[in-house]
C-alpha cells in the first residue's frame, strides 16, 4: 500500500485517541445474501461465536466468503470451508487496519475497526462495524456533504457529533448504536479525504447545546430554498432552537430550484380522492391552481404540505403552483431540497465561501444555541501518533517533499502540527489563529 493512505489512517488514529467506540449496522437498507471480505491494511483475527479462533493475522491476499445457512453464518477462507457459526467477528490487531466489504451485486466499501457478522431474523447477513466514535463521525461527514473547504466539514462534524451523542441508543434494542442509512446518518465508507479528517479534528470535543446546556437535535437538509422551516411545521414538537430564518445563502446552489409538471386532472383528483375536497368549489379550485409561497406556508386548502411532498415525492414543501389552462397542465415550481428544518448544507457551503465563521453559521441555523467545548477532554496529538508519523518520515523522505501540490501542502500542515504538539501546545479549536492556520482548500 502507498504511503499516503497509511498516513491518512494515522491521521484518523489521531482523531480517535480518546474516543469511545460505537457499533454501526452496515448496508442497513440492503439485503445481503453473500459477501466477500478482504484486507486492505493490517491484519485481523477471525473469531467464531466470540471464543473460537478460526484464523490469526489474516492480511492482504486473503479472502473470506460469508453467506447465511439457516440461522448460521457459513465461513470459507480462500475457498476452504471452515464451518458455520452463530456469529463471526473480524478483530483488528492494530489501529491501522482496513477491511474491504464486497457484497454480491452491491458496490464494495472499506471500513476501519472490527466487524461482527450474524444472521438476522429475515435469514440474511447482518454486518456491524465496531469502530472508534470519531472515525465514524469522519465517515459520516464524507457521506453527508460535498465541498472543498475545511470549515464546511467542521460544521458538519459538529452537528453530526451532536446528533450521534444525543441519539447514541437509537438502535440499542437491535444490539447496535446506529444504522448507516439516512434513518440515522449516512456512513457509506471510511473517510479517505484528508481535508475532511482535518475538519473533523478541528471540531474535536465540540457539540451544540441549548441554554440549559443540553444537547440539541441537529436536523439538516440539502437546501432551504431561501428560508428554513419551523420544527412544528414539519414534525410535532416546537423547539426554540429550530425556528424559521431567512436563508439567502441557499440561493443559486445545486439544489436551489426544482420543477415538477403534472396534468391538471392528476393534481385536482389527488385532492378530491385523497383529501375529499370539493374541487368544483370555486374558492378551493382557485387556491389549488394559484397557490404561492413568498414565505413558507404549512398547508394548502388545509392539506399539510408535508403530506403532498411525500405523496408526489417532491424535493421540498416550498413550491408555487403555475396553471396553464390551455394545456390543462400544472407546474410545481419549487425551492430547496429536504425538510427545511435546521441547517442548510448548501447554505453552509456558500457561507464558508464568503468567509463566515463556523460558529456564526451554526448560530444562524440553530436559534439561540451555543457551541460547547469539552474542556475535560481537550484534543491533543498523542505521543504514539507522533512516533508513527516520524517513523514514516524517516522511512520515506519523499513523503515530506514540499511541492506546490495541495496533497504535499496538507502533509506539511500535519508535520507542523506534530511540531506544535512536541512543544506541548494544546490545540484549542476556539483559537482564531489556529483556525486560520488550519484553513485548507482541497
Task: Locate each region found by the language model.
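Conserved, single-site charged/polar hotspot
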Residues: 4-7, 11, 17-442
Amino acid at each position: 500500500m502507498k504511503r499516503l493512505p497509511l498516513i491518512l489512517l494515522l491521521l484518523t488514529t489521531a482523531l480517535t485517541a480518546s474516543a469511545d467506540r460505537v457499533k454501526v449496522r452496515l448496508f442497513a437498507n440492503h439485503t445481503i445474501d453473500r459477501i466477500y471480505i478482504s484486507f486492505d491494511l493490517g491484519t485481523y483475527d477471525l473469531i467464531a461465536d466470540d471464543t473460537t479462533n478460526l484464523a490469526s493475522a489474516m492480511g492482504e491476499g486473503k479472502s473470506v466468503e460469508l453467506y447465511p445457512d439457516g440461522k448460521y453464518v457459513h465461513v470459507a477462507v480462500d475457498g476452504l470451508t471452515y464451518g458455520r457459526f452463530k456469529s463471526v467477528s473480524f478483530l483488528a490487531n492494530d489501529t491501522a487496519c482496513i477491511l474491504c466489504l464486497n457484497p454480491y451485486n452491491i458496490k464494495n466499501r472499506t471500513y476501519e475497526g472490527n466487524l461482527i457478522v450474524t444472521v438476522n431474523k429475515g435469514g440474511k447477513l447482518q454486518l456491524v462495524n465496531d469502530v472508534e466514535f470519531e472515525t465514524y463521525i469522519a465517515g459520516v461527514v464524507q457521506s453527508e456533504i460535498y465541498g472543498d473547504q475545511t470549515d464546511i466539514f467542521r460544521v458538519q462534524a459538529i452537528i453530526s457529533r451532536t446528533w450521534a451523542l444525543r441519539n447514541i441508543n437509537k438502535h440499542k434494542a437491535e444490539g447496535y448504536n446506529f444504522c448507516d442509512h439516512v434513518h440515522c446518518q449516512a456512513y457509506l465508507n471510511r473517510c479517505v479525504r484528508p481535508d475532511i479528517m482535518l475538519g473533523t479534528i478541528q471540531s474535536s470535543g465540540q457539540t451544540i447545546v441549548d441554554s440549559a446546556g443540553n444537547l440539541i437535535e441537529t436536523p439538516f437538509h440539502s437546501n432551504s430554498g431561501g428560508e428554513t422551516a419551523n420544527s412544528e411545521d414539519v414534525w410535532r414538537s416546537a423547539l426554540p432552537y429550530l425556528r424559521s430564518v431567512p436563508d439567502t445563502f441557499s440561493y443559486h446552489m445545486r439544489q436551489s430550484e426544482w420543477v415538477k409538471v403534472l396534468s391538471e386532472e392528476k393534481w385536482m383528483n389527488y385532492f378530491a380522492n385523497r383529501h375529499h375536497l370539493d374541487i368544483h368549489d370555486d374558492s378551493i379550485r382557485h387556491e389549488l391552481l394559484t397557490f404561492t409561497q413568498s414565505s413558507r406556508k404549512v398547508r394548502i386548502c388545509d392539506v399539510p404540505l408535508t403530506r403532498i411532498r411525500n405523496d408526489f415525492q417532491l424535493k421540498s414543501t416550498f413550491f408555487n403552483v403555475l396553471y396553464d389552462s390551455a394545456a390543462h397542465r400544472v407546474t410545481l415550481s419549487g425551492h430547496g431540497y429536504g425538510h427545511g428544518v435546521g441547517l442548510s448544507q448548501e447554505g453552509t457551503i456558500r457561507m464558508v465561501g464568503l468567509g463566515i465563521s463556523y460558529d456564526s453559521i451554526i448560530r444562524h441555523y440553530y436559534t439561540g444555541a451555543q457551541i460547547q467545548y469539552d474542556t475535560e477532554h481537550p484534543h491533543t496529538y498523542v505521543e504514539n501518533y507522533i512516533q508513527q508519523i516520524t517513523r514514516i518520515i524517516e522511512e520515506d523522505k519523499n513523503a515530506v517533499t514540499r511541492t506546490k501540490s495541495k496533497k504535499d501542502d496538507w502533509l506539511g500542515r500535519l508535520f507542523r502540527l506534530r511540531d506544535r504538539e512536541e512543544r506541548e501546545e494544546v490545540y484549542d479549536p476556539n483559537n482564531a489563529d489556529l483556525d486560520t492556520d488550519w484553513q485548507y482548500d482541497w
